[in-house]
């Protein structure tokens, strides 16, 4: 029995050494786990700090983009006001153009009326000239059918008439104040006055028509220039508005993306905490 006790006493130190070794391993393992967890916590703290900084920067960017969006909306409102003013000005110009067109149509109608009157007078003159010519022809035909005696009597009467007229003319020539010379001079003077009046009227109307043509041509060119200029302004304004609207849509999309990113970052921060 004493031998057994000695053997048992010799076996206890080995078991104690094994327990001590396993305990030390466990302690070392726990220490390593704690160290690893502490290192992981430090990393997570750094990540959390960086995420908070990024979130702060994103909030700053969102605020800046929001301010820029408001400024863009203000510019769009100003552009809309400018477009509205331009439309009003174009409406005013169109009213003026319609008024000028009405005046032009009226003048054209007056010119056409004057042309029609002139043509009517020419038709009447041609008809009168044709009648005179026909009368002369018919008179010639009748005269060609007269007999010799009839022609002789008529020629004698005509010669007598010519002699009488010759005597009257001789008397009128000897008397400067004679009725026939005075009448002829008055007729000549009246004809000259009428010719001068007609010439002056023709010159005046011609000058007036030329001035009207020049005025109409000038107005037409000015209207074309104004139309081209305002068309260019409207096109430029439409391009600017389209560009601003495109930028606005892009900024809204960027804000949405930033808000999504911020929401994801907040979610990550909440999970880390």
Curated annotation (Swiss-Prot):
It comes from the Eukaryota. Keywords: Coiled coil. Residues 24-116, 179-269 form a coiled coil. Residues 1-39 are annotated as: Disordered. Residues 1-17 have a biased composition (Basic and acidic residues). This is Coiled-coil domain-containing protein 122.
